[in-house]
A protein has these predicted regions:
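Low-complexity, highly charged intrinsically disordered N-terminal segments
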Residues: 1-7
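Domain-scale recognition of functional cores that engage charged ligands
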Residues: 26-28, 45-47, 52-170
Length: 170
């Protein structure tokens, strides 16, 4: 749709070059096989936090710790704020599993001293060249929400303007 393309162009114009994907793997006779790649709302963060303990309990003591994604995500989001404004964690309020992921990210951001807000995408409002939620200015937008669900949203122009101008980072 036009709105989806406009959102993608706004992120590109705002110099957003980051992406987070989840690849689901199944173990079979011939090793691991990918069964799904989730690029729009890749969850599993909460579940992954338990993998090191489960692996160690099963006797696997070497290997790569997959839980580094939360640390790296939080570091990147905090650096994008450049010391001002909040990080808005936008999620689909109808899905408890989406809230679960965003609440985990919020908790980890707050533990590091960042201001992180949980909100639906419709809560974003224009504030000058940027965005706000309530009275809180937003400097970073983490969208854990399918782009196509934003189609026709009343505040879409405000989001597009803020992101494409670089006033709000994604």
């Amino acid at each position: 749709s036009d709105d989806v393309r406009r959102l993608a162009r706004a992120s590109w114009s705002g110099r957003d070059r980051s992406a987070l994907y989840r690849v689901d793997l199944l173990w079979g006779q011939h090793g691991f096989r990918a069964c799904e790649i989730n690029a729009d709302c890749p969850g599993g963060h909460n579940e992954a936090l338990g993998l090191p303990l489960l692996s160690q309990a099963a006797g696997f003591w070497s290997g790569i710790n997959p839980t580094a994604v939360i640390d790296k995500l939080c570091q990147e989001l905090i650096s994008l704020t450049q010391g001002h404004g909040a990080i808005a964690l936008i999620y689909a309020t109808a899905y408890a599993e989406d809230l679960q992921v965003c609440a985990l990210v919020q908790r980890e951001l707050q533990r590091r001293g960042a201001t992180a807000l949980l909100a639906p995408p419709t809560a974003l409002r224009r504030k000058g060249k940027g965005l706000c939620i309530g009275k809180q200015s937003v400097s970073v937008l983490y969208r854990y929400f399918p782009t196509e669900y934003m189609e026709g949203q009343r505040n879409l122009s405000a989001i597009l303007d803020a992101v494409s101008s670089g006033s709000v980072k994604t």
